[in-house]
């Protein structure tokens, strides 16, 4: 099937399923009391279900859910077919307004998953990350551009203010945005910081709101300062111990996209442009094979993670659209076609992980489907194919 058909096959299944599905991190959401109450059963369920190649969730009493981050991502994809999918877009907007935590926190923000996430040393009851809230905020910004409802504008600005007032950190002459409100002020996650900084710039510029340009720019330049000589970024830095986590994957694309957001919105200065080009070349040459298959975590080749595939489509399409070379759009097409051929189920959904001899075919609606429909929508929009369904 072609790219447009693949997009509609997936989004139509998501609509049919009412945007409900499983998640890699939903293992602690069991309906069984022993898992809900006790640490070790909860930890076992969380990690067993996350890493099992087979879906045992029904046995563990884990239900499919509608997650706020999923519908926010899905809404961003559906907006490319606004008139056709207006009913579902309005449903998503209303659902997100209803589930906002503004009464609790004073700002529009969301529990992104709707279930607890058990880590080895932490039970996260409310999943409120800057990345997920940035996705939802971006959905309302794009929705406002098509439907200038003051309620949507207020939400966009409220999310921006939440980030600026509760996430911004100044530590050891470094400025960054935290991953969550509870994140320690010494844990600096590079991609999370630039995602928030870019959102604040986009909203401030669009609604003509004054903002601290110097702090936002420094949040970007401080991340640029962590770029490695070849062009890659690692994942995070513990500013107390100096330990830098050496993880190179789809988060490289997150940083590149947000650098592009800043440059398109503010200025193409030489430092930003050189960093972007160097990072883009690394992403293109080192994190993907010529056939469109992504590298799991550079230099580790397998498994193929659907998030890597989706992000590659987004980042290379955007690079081409910004004038950095049509070959990037050609490569986005190569990635999309490889993914559709090798990681899309005949039923429409996308697979989670692909190994040389085995594929994890569990359907994860947030991690896999929402990411891919958004990526394909970005591609189709630039290709001029987002006017109507096939």
Which functions belong to the PLM regions below?
Residues 1-390:
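Glycan-recognition and catalytic cores of secretory/periplasmic carbohydrate-active enzymes
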